[in-house]
Amino acid sequence: MSSKVAINSDIGQALWAVEQLQMEAGIDQVKVRVGASAGGGKRWEHMGQGTGACLGLVWLNQLVCRCPKMAADLLKFCTEQAKNDPFLVGIPAATNSFKEKKPYAIL
């Protein structure tokens, strides 16, 4: 019986992995690598650009970004999603399942 449970678990994990990979296949990704910059911070370089000078350098939180479009897209996504983030806007007390319920007295 335990082998049957293990097989079902393996199938479930495989199905989850396939679903995850299918989702990731549809995402347009930009490859970046981290290198040391002269200023002591980290520098993100687009893999296809090499190490030459880039006119479109953008400073983001002490990082020199060689992919300003990618950084702008990420910043846009974060600001759009911020209104739905429970860590930023909080959870309404009526829907918070972790909030302690008010005690009541049994008569």
From Swiss-Prot:
Keywords: Cell membrane, Membrane, Transducer. Pfam families: G-gamma. It comes from the Eukaryota. It is found in: Cell membrane. Residues 69-107 form the G protein gamma domain. InterPro entries: G-protein_gamma-like_dom, GGL_sf, Gprotein-gamma. GO terms for biological process: G protein-coupled receptor signaling pathway. GO terms for molecular function: G-protein beta-subunit binding. GO terms for cellular component: heterotrimeric G-protein complex. G proteins are composed of 3 units; alpha, beta and gamma. Guanine nucleotide-binding proteins (G proteins) are involved as a modulator or transducer in various transmembrane signaling systems. The beta and gamma chains are required for the GTPase activity, for replacement of GDP by GTP, and for G protein-effector interaction. Belongs to the G protein gamma family. This is Guanine nucleotide-binding protein G(I)/G(S)/G(O) subunit gamma-14. It comes from Homo sapiens. The gene is GNG14.
